[in-house]
Amino acid sequence: SERLRYLIPFGQPHEVIEYLIRVADEHPGAVTVFGDDGEKLGTWPETHKHCYHDGWLERFFNVLVENQHWLQVTTFSEAIDHTKPVGKIYLPDSSYREMTEWALPAEQLVEYDRTVHELEHDPRWPAVKRFVRGGFWRNFKVKYVESDEMYSRMMNISRRLEQAVQAGAPHEIVDRARAELYRGQCNCGYWHGAFGGIYLPHLRNAVYRHLIAADNLLNEAQGRPERWIEAKAEDFNFDAAPEVQLANDRLNALIAPRRGGHLYELDVRSICHNLLATITRRPEAYHRKVIGGGNNGNGSCASIHERVVFKQAGLDQRIQYDSYPRKSLVDLFYDHGVTLEAVAAGQAAQRGDFVGGEYEAKLRRNPDRIQVLMIRDGQAFGMPIRINKGLTLEIAYLLEGLPQDRPLHFAVEFNFAGMPAGADDRYFYERHPEQQPEFPNRYGQLGTRLDLSGAQGLGLVDEWLGIDVGLTASQPTGFWTFPVETVSQSEGGFELVHQSVAVQPHWLA
């Protein structure tokens, strides 16, 4: 019962009884079902005071006792055992109403909300609202490509698990891998609505942590040697186009040649962490509320579906959308005088067609290494340019066709996720290409904007995670860094969330 979901605990206890009386009058002997999150009774914002200090829960139990002469509290199993079936019904693929609304694309959700609010004042609404529904849950995998990336990774590991079972792999290892796979299927990080969901980095990181752990165990079950490397080209994300996987005993990399030649997953096996569990900033229907401001009005305890709370000031000024995915090996051409501020704000014009353009990919296998070579003949500033980028888990770029009479401003973006800002044990430092000093020069926390020139390299450290990422260049290079932050909604309200660190080495080529 959707009505009970909103009345418990946000309505008065007597309103619950009044609703149940109406149901009993219209349908004698009916079973009314309430099933919802236990967090509503004390964990969600303001509900602990409401339920316990203000006495809602005690008053609710009291009215149930007072009406027990006609109202029986029961369980699902008891209802099945003692209630005669009324008939047969087949349910479609579905979820609760709000979830189907959240699955809609942002612009359609805005139109849906507007239409529903208009129809609510129509006298026919009580009769027709049951026929009004939103979207399909699986559309979350289209609305958020990051959800689809997790889903695709999960499905491929599930397939590997089945292959291991069929091959007679050791049961103990297979069982551990299966448990990790199931943990990686926890749905919370795959969608987004009134809850933080996919916008919460710790949920995405947790999904990948378990999936990578399962992958590692399956490598063990397969009996791989201590040192190994492999490369495969197949449709890993079910988009009818081949991706490339480079993997060894330490790392796993997934590259999408037809989507800008981006590196979209980079797993560090030893800590079960995907450095590219990033998210791209996109419009959300609720951003209208952030821009408009507001609150839930009377100060009473409100459902999270109705609350408008800002966890930080000035969030309307922090909303920003990305014009390309926040991944790595993103090839960018800028005007000469572009600034870090313009790049970080997404206001720097793109002068090339390489950001999302299709690259031709080739796998090169040698006895001592495997390389993915990606080539695109495109344009920058109206001139034909060829970019060759080779990835061996060491990256090499060759730009051909550069004009002789003018330099071009070229940058490559990398993103690093799961390395939060705002902590002294997570920081940038000066990276040296040869001998690294014991105590390198620090540039500040990972949320710092840096505009470095003539640098040989840049390092990023997360001491808590236990990782040191180093970028070194073959010649002095400019480095830009800036945080990627979203304004998103959770049960606590609207908040600014650090998602990744963007690093752009850039050159006048």
Can you describe what each PLM-predicted range is?
Residues R3-L251, A256-G260, V268-I271, W464-G466, ...:
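Active-site and substrate-binding clefts of carbohydrate-active enzymes
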Residues G189, Y199-H202, A206-E226, G346-V355, ...:
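Terminal, compositionally biased non-globular sequences in eukaryotic proteins
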Residues D249-K362, L373:
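Acidic-aromatic substrate-binding/catalytic surfaces of carbohydrate-active enzymes
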Residues G260, Y264-I271, T278-E284, V290, ...:
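Acidic (Asp/Glu-rich), glycine- and aromatic
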Residues A349-G382, T392-Q404, G454-A509:
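Beta-strand-rich recognition/accessory modules
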Residues I385:
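Extended lipid/amphipathic-ligand handling interfaces
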Residues V412, A417, D425-P437, G447-G478:
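Surface-exposed interaction patch
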Residues A421-Y443, P483-Q499:
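Solvent-exposed beta-strand/loop surfaces of large extracellular or lumenal domains
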